């Protein structure tokens, strides 16, 4: 069983949301537009993701950023969880 007090569970949901959108958009500027934040905010998020997961996350390839295999796999796993969290926060409370 997972230790719920583990420091590895200290996740920033916004950071995970940035990861998902970065993998989808493959562009810092389009990610910033979609999330209604500045490009420096997205760049700072990339830096935090790289440090947190010890992975380049995105690698420049011409005009776009290509996700690493780890970033792609993480985004694919995280996206449905983020959707569910959003749905839970939108449900009426009774």
Where are the regions that the model predicts?
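A short LG(V/I)-centered, amphipathic sequence patch enriched
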Residues: 50-67
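Short alpha-helical "packing" element that flanks the helix-turn-helix/winged-helix DNA-binding module
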Residues: 15-22, 74
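Helix-turn-helix DNA-binding elements, focusing on the entry/boundary residues of the two helices
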Residues: 27-28, 46, 60
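The N-cap/first-turn positions of alpha helices
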Residues: 12-15, 39, 71, 78, ...
